[in-house]
Amino acid sequence: MQPAGISHSLFPSLPPEFLPLALYTLAASILIGVLLLAAWWLGAKTTNRNKELPYESGAIPTGSARLAYPVPFYLIAIFFIVFDVEAAFIFAWATAWRELGLQGLVHITFFIVILLLGLVWLWLKGGLDWGPSRARRGHVRD
């Protein structure tokens, strides 16, 4: 029999399902630390020029491997990430549309309208133009 106020759990306010998760997280963190330490300890300490060269099917590299990507590439990548995350929200809504009813339909319609307004604004600002601008192509009317 236990005296009043003493609990079996180390953290009585946490649910009992927390202990396996905490132990798993601790074990994974220790394993990662051990593997990183072993890689550092067992890894090669010396470097030379031949070890740092990229290996491409036995071909000797010529020139620099660094390529300058145009800035619009990064803009398109960021726009893709933003719209991809928003698509994830739409897919989540689509899986629960029966439970959400009319209120969910109104909310997702509002969400999609905001997305479309953002896309139109982006298009009008020239964020989706990849090539030369219209002013440089001579298509601007006076």
Curated annotation (Swiss-Prot):
NDH-1 is composed of 14 different subunits. Subunits NuoA, H, J, K, L, M, N constitute the membrane sector of the complex. The gene is nuoA2. It is an enzyme of class 7 (translocase). It catalyses: a quinone + NADH + 5 H(+)(in) = a quinol + NAD(+) + 4 H(+)(out). GO terms for molecular function: NADH dehydrogenase (ubiquinone) activity; NADH:ubiquinone reductase (non-electrogenic) activity; quinone binding. PANTHER family: NADH-QUINONE OXIDOREDUCTASE SUBUNIT A, NADH-UBIQUINONE OXIDOREDUCTASE CHAIN 3. Pfam families: Oxidored_q4 (PF00507). This is NADH-quinone oxidoreductase subunit A 2. Its EC number is 7.1.1.-. One of its GO terms (cellular component) is respiratory chain complex I.
